[in-house]
Regions:
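Active-site-proximal cap/loop segments of hydrolase catalytic domains
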Residues: 376, 383-530
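Non-catalytic accessory segments flanking enzyme active sites
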Residues: 12, 55-58, 64-66, 81-88, ...
Length: 530
């Protein structure tokens, strides 16, 4: 939805017409449609701010191998579409001229377009297997009038995307704490940064110098927008087990929370010419709701309550926060779900759910593993975010690196025991644990360390670190963070000691292994060999 100024608001959308894909405008007051382009080129596109041009991302199919014998050029060549490339094209809405702007050996990605529509910011990515990180990004500024190119940086590590400031003099850059020679890093001596923990930087185009924006800000940056209306930066981030919006003043670096009405903000959009933010989100016990937020007054207005429709006639149990201090004094955050019609005088079986990897188990109602669904079956459900999780600060996230169960498993075991001690309604002899992917690994690993669980479920779990690292499509990529600098040849004891497969004789708990036979990330062999 865009505005043509003077209060003339309209919606642009595509539809299939007689001559192909049509670009149309829709007047939201009358629903009258006007065809702007009768035969639009196919592909994904974005408007330039002046709405005179469409910038396309066009996929080109790469060279094919024969069907009988395939040469794998590099590990990523096993992934479908690896040899395809995406390039940027420009479509002039007035003249109909459609021209290619980028080409070459690597993909090119649209990052942003300047407010005056003159400059395009785009990037490329190169793979590097001999050092960390395994990808390096280059950023370019293209003058769409003269076609002159300005190389901002080449093959830089730990930087992801960039966007123009409203005046075009600075860039807002997303990356890891190690970006720009580590100016945004905030970890203890001896730690290795967890590059899944997102940071923001300001980059001055005149001086070519960067400065950190979120170095001392604990939440993990997911997305950010530099608003043209008020010049503030709006940040969507993981904040412990919440997903929140914060605003940052680029003039002084001060960050404050936007008082949204939901625990998990799924998506948001800012008006270009008004102090309005729209967002939708959900919480631990409700589905999505859409809101309008007044940036000046700080008030929320409910626009549409989808949750009311989705949860009609559904009874949910209560959800409570429950934290504990680990042996080293760290507060480990968690929460628990009670069955509907809970009776505190009864004894209930309990499920302990965790991921244990680097992403938090957040408070969303709707997720792959719905805690409320398990609670509805008569279980108490306890979930926690142990050391290594993003959203709790860089130091906490860095604990994930070269852990693979170390510290994390101890915290899960300690939390489970303390929870049972403090909650008499749990039947200590009927505790099960479940997790998937890294959580599946954690399920297997836990059974080599404790017998407190009556049953355990590993979904798509990793049983041997070396085979996951070498065979999974993204194994070496994830391991470039999860075990940075550690390989089977320089740390064979670590790869065996932390692998559940090499400790399988210690497992006495009934263990169910669930796996998809087409899994390419954690191949099914991880469960078969276990």
């Amino acid at each position: 939805v865009r505005s043509r100024g003077l209060g003339d608001v309209y919606k642009r959308q595509t539809r299939t017409g007689l001559d192909g894909t049509e670009l149309v405008t829709v007047d939201p007051a009358t629903y009258q449609q006007t065809v702007l382009v009768p035969n639009l080129p196919k592909g994904r596109f974005v408007f330039t701010p002046d709405e005179s041009t469409l910038l396309y991302t066009v996929e080109e199919e790469g060279p094919k191998e024969g069907t009988d014998l395939i040469r794998v050029l590099e590990p990523a060549d096993r992934i479908p579409g690896f040899r395809d490339r995406s390039f940027i094209w420009r479509y002039d809405l007035k003249t109909g001229l459609y021209e290619q702007l980028t080409f070459g050996h690597t993909d090119t990605y649209i990052n942003d377009i300047s407010a005056d529509s003159r400059y395009l910011l785009f990037s490329t990515s190169d793979r590097v297997y001999t050092s960390l990180p395994h990808s390096r990004n280059s950023l370019y500024k293209l003058d769409l009038q003269t076609m002159a190119i300005d190389t901002i940086w080449e093959k830089a590590p730990y930087v992801n995307q960039a966007a123009f400031s409203p005046d075009g003099k600075q860039l807002l850059v997303a990356g890891a704490g190690d970006a720009f020679d580590g100016i945004g890093r905030n970890i203890k001596q001896g730690q290795i940064s967890n590059s899944y923990d997102g940071q923001l930087f300001l980059y001055d185009l005149a001086s070519r110098k960067a400065s950190p924006l979120t170095k001392d800000f604990n939440p993990n940056v997911i997305d950010a927008v530099w608003n043209r209306f008020n010049g503030q930066i709006y940040i969507l981030c993981e904040d412990e087990d919440y997903q929140r919006i914060y605003t940052c003043d680029p003039a002084n670096g001060k960050i404050k929370q936007v008082a949204a009405s939901e625990d998990i903000i799924m998506s948001y959009a800012l008006a270009d010419n008004a102090p309005v933010l729209f967002y939708y989100g959900q919480s631990a016990s409700n589905a999505n709701r859409l809101y309008a937020y007044d940036l000046k007054g700080g008030k929320n207005r409910l626009v549409y309550d989808l949750s009311q429709d989705k949860l009609k006639d559904i009874a949910l149990g209560e959800v409570h926060d429950w934290n504990f201090k680990s042996d080293d004094g760290t507060t480990i955050q968690g929460r628990y779900y009670l069955p509907p019609h809970f009776d505190p005088n009864k004894k209930y079986p309990m499920i302990v759910y965790y991921y244990g990897g680097t992403s938090p188990t957040n408070r969303a109602l709707e997720m792959r593993y719905s805690m409320h669904m398990y609670a509805a079956l008569g279980y108490v459900v306890y979930t926690l975010n142990p050391s290594g999780t993003t959203g709790f600060g860089q130091e906490f996230a860095a604990r994930h690196v070269n852990a693979w169960g170390l510290k994390t498993a101890d915290e899960i075991i300690q939390g489970t025991k303390l929870f049972c001690k403090e909650h008499s309604f749990v039947n200590e002899k009927k505790i099960g644990c479940i997790g998937a992917s890294y959580g599946g690994f954690m399920t297997q690993y836990l059974q080599t360390r404790t017998d407190i669980f009556a049953a355990a479920i590993s979904h798509a779990g990793i049983s041997a670190l070396s085979s996951y690292w070498g065979e999974g499509y993204w194994g070496y990529g994830y391991c470039s963070v999860a075990n940075a600098g550690t390989y089977p040849w320089n740390a064979p004891e670590f790869f065996t000691k932390q692998s559940p497969l090499f400790n399988a004789d210690k497992i006495k708990t009934p263990l169910l292994l669930l796996h998809g036979n087409a899994d390419t990330n954690v191949p099914i062999g991880e469960s078969i060999q276990m």
